[in-house]
Amino acid sequence: MKRIPMTLRGAEKLREELDYLRNVLRPEIIKNISEAREHGDLKENAEYHAAREQQGFCEGRIQEIESKLFNAHIIDITKLTTDDKVVFGATVGVENLDTTYRQTYSIVGDDEANLKEHMISINSPIARGLIGHKEGDIVRINTPKGKVRYKILQVKYC
């Protein structure tokens, strides 16, 4: 299977969620199933069926996270030689030269991407267009809205 790039922070968030699911939610669901069984007939026991459904979702998410972590290529940006270029894990300040709108993006793995937090996937058009360029460069990027010119204002590695 293909290794998936992931930042240290992204891997840590997944480990925290996995820990919560295994050590808090899973035991709670098992307790709920046990209590629901005590209420008698399981065919018409809504509490039992709800708890079993919740157990299925929990176990599925545990397997999904374990698989992601197993296949992750965790990249510590602080240990990379970057030559001041935009690379995976970098935080990049850009200005749209057509609108003068300024924005900062962190380039992360697919599973970490969250536009509300200004975290874009390494596979997004903007990230692909910025990779390999330096502060001060002007890049043309094909986006779903058409070609956009960006000036790279700042590149940070944290």
From Swiss-Prot:
Molecular function GO labels: DNA binding; RNA polymerase binding
Keyword annotations from UniProtKB, A to Z: DNA-binding, Transcription, Transcription regulation
Highest taxon above the source species: Bacteria
Classification via InterPro entries: GreA/GreB_C_sf, TF_GreA/GreB_CS, Tscrpt_elong_fac_GreA, Tscrpt_elong_fac_GreA/B, Tscrpt_elong_fac_GreA/B_C, Tscrpt_elong_fac_GreA/B_fam, Tscrpt_elong_fac_GreA/B_N, Tscrpt_elong_fac_GreA/B_N_sf
BP-aspect Gene Ontology terms: DNA-templated transcription elongation; regulation of DNA-templated transcription elongation
Purpose: Necessary for efficient RNA polymerase transcription elongation past template-encoded arresting sites. The arresting sites in DNA have the property of trapping a certain fraction of elongating RNA polymerases that pass through, resulting in locked ternary complexes. Cleavage of the nascent transcript by cleavage factors such as GreA or GreB allows the resumption of elongation from the new 3'terminus. GreA releases sequences of 2 to 3 nucleotides.
Family: Belongs to the GreA/GreB family.
Protein name: Transcription elongation factor GreA
